[in-house]
Amino acid sequence: MLWKSLIALCVIGAAVAEQTPVFLWGANSVAKPSLKTVSQVEFAEQLAALLEDHMVVAFEENGLSSKDFLCSNSQAQSCYAQLQGVSPKTYYTSVENPSEALRSVAAKREHNSIDASGKLTTPAKCAVGTALFVTFEDAAESREASLESHDAAIAAISKQFECKVAYLYLAAPSTAPVVQRRTRRDTAATTGGIMWKSTNQFQIFYTALLYNGNPITVTDLKLTNSSSTKLSVVMDTSVADKPITFDVVYNGGYFSLSNLVYDNNNFRSSGVNAPTTFSYSCGNLTLESAAVNNMYNTLSFKSLQLQAPFDGTYKEDFPFGDSWDCVGFVTPGILMGLFVVALLLVIMFVGVCWMMDINTMDRFDDPKGKTITINAAAE
């Protein structure tokens, strides 16, 4: 039984050990026969010698195999056009756990990643004896396009180091986490409508603008900085001398609309506000003016979204922040539902209490006892 257990452990150990290709360049190294697997210990000794006078940068490619080095693009050119021209270089067909071998001999280890633009997310400093592990962000593209973009990124990053550097291109360990990043997107669709922008200070989007149910056409937007906490916006319309004017005021981390005027009517806009890092969003915003002779005017925005960051670090054409919706968390429908549920609970509680108050009779007719006789006498 003991020797069977030892054989099983050896088989499991051989299965767990990862044997992947490694491409090394930037330093002289000993070539190995292509049919021979370089053990982890042997490869670690070779890397330890390199770390004495080199910095080692390891680019870890997810799922790298020998077939990837035969990759070609749509123009029948190699996906590794940049790596083909480096020297000196050595290709190892099979190396046992190359990443672990580097980790075991590197006293100083750093980790970094390459973003979608092909640049390091954190600037790296050149230091002899340091092992830098670089991963790639996953992108929704073909394997050929991914390898080709990684090849260009590796070539660009290799030129940034001024000290002696040995580079490794190897497979990422199967247990290594996959780097994923969320791309910021607009929280509301900005297609099929009208967008007005003023540098990096203010932008507004809507699909329709109505005054008492009649459409309004905006021809231009002008913005004036009244102060560091107040913007004055003028939206010229197709009707002469009838612009839409309003102020955007910053207070306590929020921006809000005030003094909205159109056609000499002042509309109530006290509820139009949001944090500066968010965008105010409303599917159907209808503003009303003060009633005159029991009549009032309405100004409606369909699919409205606007934002005033009050932050100079924003770029022009900045994307809208997360949506700050005009509909409150507790809507009338939710309130009605809660009221109905509470009413049903009260009815159920009262009914259960009544059922618990039902008492049985404390006296019963005994069939073995004396018969109860009731004489019915006529009076």
Swiss-Prot record:
The protein's UniProt keywords, in alphabetical order, are: Disulfide bond, Endoplasmic reticulum, Glycoprotein, Membrane, Signal, Transmembrane, Transmembrane helix
Q: Which domain of life is it from?
A: Eukaryota
Protein's cellular compartments: Endoplasmic reticulum membrane
- Spell out which residues lie on the membrane's Cytoplasmic side: 355-379
Transmembrane parts of this sequence? 334-354
Q: Listed disulfide bonds for this chain?
A: C282-C326
Q: Which residues are glycosylated?
A: N225, N284
Q: Which residues does UniProt assign to the signal peptide?
A: 1-17
Q: Does the keyword section mention Ligase?
A: no
Q: Which Pfam families match?
A: Ac45-VOA1_TM (PF20520), VAS1_LD (PF05827)
Biological processes annotated in GO = regulation of cellular pH; vacuolar proton-transporting V-type ATPase complex assembly
Q: How does it assemble?
A: Accessory component of the multisubunit proton-transporting vacuolar (V)-ATPase protein pump. May interact with ATP6AP2.
- Descriptive protein name: V-type proton ATPase subunit S1
